[in-house]
């Protein structure tokens, strides 16, 4: 039987499949027979009799009957100018994944990590495109890492490989990480189809409706400001949920050449941003130990449950105390001598010290609504020691010191007047701080309510 006769014979079996011609030509390459198209095949096929007939038959059966992915049969896949070896047990590289590389801002990056690297597609392509980068690839599957190392040699690039589970790999990188790029498992069970049956399930499916890995990465980013950029692949069917998860970060969507959504680029050089109405989300970040930068009725302030965190951010004397903000419903928790004054002076720009602790109920309806959710919390002006707070939130996003802090920004339509509150010490009966205008107002309120200073 010559090659032409084999083609006709197999076309009778599988010719109803619209991909038969292309698959046949591709599989011939595995056996050293290369034809540009069917015309070239027909021109020479009748004269070719020395070939592995049974091998070609078995390969066609593996594809059309057993539905084994073509790259597993051929043993390799070509993506642009790069060639990747493939084998069962390791996720097959996809050309669309390379669309993630077009958003890499490599000019300011030195070290990049490809998490869940599989056969090394993104790590190798990244190193090939940006040779100056120090690139790591990590995966939990030792078989995948062995194949990735082969692919790196095949494509003549140097990548360092780490066997570790997702974020655990980052602890094994000894230099500051600037870029994380990842195509982790993101499908749920309902999204699997028969064409994926032969690929490793743990490379495809994630718990938590497919976003488990992204939730872990979200939590990691909240406390790791040194990572400048994160690039993620995800399913188009998860776009809405995916964008919602990372909505507090500055992001841009990534699309393939076919204009299909494939992932997201996160600019982690900017602080996360929430609106003041997102009270539950704000409390969740505060509970994680983050500090809010938020406009108050006086100045742009810092809010945190931890005084030590405020000391660290402000770089100030740890022996000083901070004002505690509270909601109206919490006034009855105050010392008795302050409860009466609270009803007369609050909400307003008056801070009272009693028993060595400072309290204030701010004059901002939006802020009071937030305080009802977050509870009693420490607040201070958003500045370093011996410096003044900025007048605009945007200034914090553009300041190299502040964007490195474990902070997030809360947008509030209420504008601060850039004047600190008056402070009155009930323990010593003394005014600790206040402008001349504030003193006049304070004295007027004392007189109105027939109170003695």
From Swiss-Prot:
Name the InterPro entries for this protein. Answer: DHBP_synth_RibB-like_a/b_dom, DNA_methylase_N6_adenine_CS, N5-glutamine_MTase, SAM-dependent_MTases_sf, Small_mtfrase_dom, Sua5-like_dom
* Tree of life domain: Bacteria
Q: Which Gene3D superfamilies match?
A: DHBP synthase, Vaccinia Virus protein VP39
Q: Which residues form the YrdC-like domain?
A: 276-437
Q: Which GO terms describe its biological process?
A: methylation
Please report a single Pfam family linked to this protein.
Sua5_yciO_yrdC
Single annotated GO MF: S-adenosylmethionine-dependent methyltransferase activity
Q: What is this protein called?
A: Uncharacterized protein MG259 homolog
